[in-house]
Amino acid sequence: IITMGMRGERDSEILGHSATLKENIDYLKEVITTQNQLIKECVNEDLDQVPRMLALYKEVEAYFHGDENTQGLKDWKELDGVTFMLCEDNFGNMRTLPTKENRDRKGGWGMYYHFDYHGDPVSYEWVNSTHLSKVWEQMCEAYDYGIRDIWVVNVGDLKPQELPLSYFLDLAYDFDKWGTLSPNKTGEYTKEWICTQFGAFFNEEEQDR
C-alpha cells in the first residue's frame, strides 16, 4: 500500500500555523497529483490497480473536510480510488465514521487504532492498558460502518502488547468468529491465547482464573 499526501515536521501542519486552510489544501492537491503521476510512471499506469491510502490524522482532517468557503479533499476526483484511513481519538474511541452516503465509496475505508500513544494531553506507553472488550466494541462499530479495507494499530514497543495485538489481528482476519455476531467472547479468546502460548505450563483450573 502506498501512502499518499504529506505531513509537516513532527506531525504538524504542512505549511505551519500562518498558512490558510486553502493554501494547505492546494499544496496537498499538488503533492497528491505529483504522487499519482509518479505512480503511473513507475508502478502502473492504471491507478486502480495500485493500493493507495490517505491517513486522516487530526492535523489533516481540516484539509479533508474544508469549510463553507473552501472545498476539502473528500470529494476530490484525484482521490476516488484511494482508501481513506480514519483515526480514533488516540485513546481507542471512534471519533468519526463513514456516513451512509459515502460508506461504499470506491477507495474504501481504513482505521488507525492505538494500543500505545506518545503525545498530548497524556502518553500511555510500555504497558498493555487497553481492554479487549473495548477493542471489540470500537472495531466492531467501525466494521459495521464500512471500515473494512485497512486496519492499522500502533503498538509502540511490541513486547507488552502481544495479547491485544493478536486479538486485533484475529478480529480482522476472522470477523465472523470474533466480531459483531460474537459478543462477550474476549474471555474465551484470552483463554485460547494463553493455552496457545503457555498451555504446557498451566492446568485447566489455572487457565480459568
Each language-model region and where it sits:
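Structured mid-domain segments that build the active-site/substrate or prosthetic-cofactor binding neighborhood
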Residues: L86-G92, T99-R209
